[in-house]
């Protein structure tokens, strides 16, 4: 992986930084990219490091401001708006992939799986803020760069989703994936 100094690693990232990642400008054209809006599931990353988290192998915390006009509320479900749970899960995968780029990994990010996901609440258009927390468990840096983490999604101070063994890989060639 690249030297951290060449990446200009920061411990937090603005919305504009996240958009730059989606354009391939943050980690370079060979690094992983976040999706662009409307699939980008966070507004900012407020903390990133390689030392803390539940396993002492890295931690990421990001936030999404909830606004009633977010696109999914208009169609999921009509008259009963709720953020699809799969979008919270995807946000956690997005953050694991971002972490792999942040530490210098190269390739296109792809979600590879999750051990277990539990949903114990929901995100409604009346909510104010979603917080994602990712606890890195392991990073493999061989032919395939892969990260494994546990994560949680909190809305307005209450944890509502948990996921174990989130897996994301970085691939040089995705044509046969």
From Swiss-Prot:
The gene is fabA. It is found in: Cytoplasm. The keyword Transmembrane does not apply. GO terms for cellular component: cytoplasm. It holds the Pfam family FabA. GO terms for molecular function: (3R)-hydroxyacyl-[acyl-carrier-protein] dehydratase activity; trans-2-decenoyl-acyl-carrier-protein isomerase activity. Signal peptide: none annotated. SUPFAM superfamilies: Thioesterase/thiol ester dehydrase-isomerase. It comes from the Bacteria. Its main location: cytoplasm. This is 3-hydroxydecanoyl-[acyl-carrier-protein] dehydratase. Keywords: Cytoplasm, Fatty acid biosynthesis, Fatty acid metabolism, Isomerase, Lipid biosynthesis, Lipid metabolism, Lyase. Homodimer.
């Amino acid at each position: 992986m690249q030297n951290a100094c060449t990446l200009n690693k920061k411990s937090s990232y603005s919305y504009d930084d996240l958009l730059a990642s989606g354009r391939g400008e943050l980690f370079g054209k060979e690094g992983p990219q976040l999706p662009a809006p409307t699939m980008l599931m966070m507004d900012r990353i407020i903390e990133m490091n390689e030392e803390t988290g539940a396993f002492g192998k890295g931690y990421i915390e990001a936030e999404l401001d909830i606004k009633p006009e977010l696109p999914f509320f208009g169609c999921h479900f009509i008259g009963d708006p709720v953020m699809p749970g799969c979008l919270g899960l995807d946000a956690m995968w997005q953050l694991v992939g971002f972490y792999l780029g942040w530490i210098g990994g190269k390739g296109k990010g792809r979600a590879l799986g999750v051990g277990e996901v539990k949903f114990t609440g929901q995100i409604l258009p009346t909510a104010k803020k979603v917080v994602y927390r990712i606890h890195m468990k392991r990073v493999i840096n061989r032919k395939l760069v892969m990260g494994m983490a546990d994560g949680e999604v909190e809305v307005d101070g209450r944890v509502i989703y948990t996921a174990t063994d989130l897996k994301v890989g970085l691939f040089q060639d995705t044509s046969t994936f």
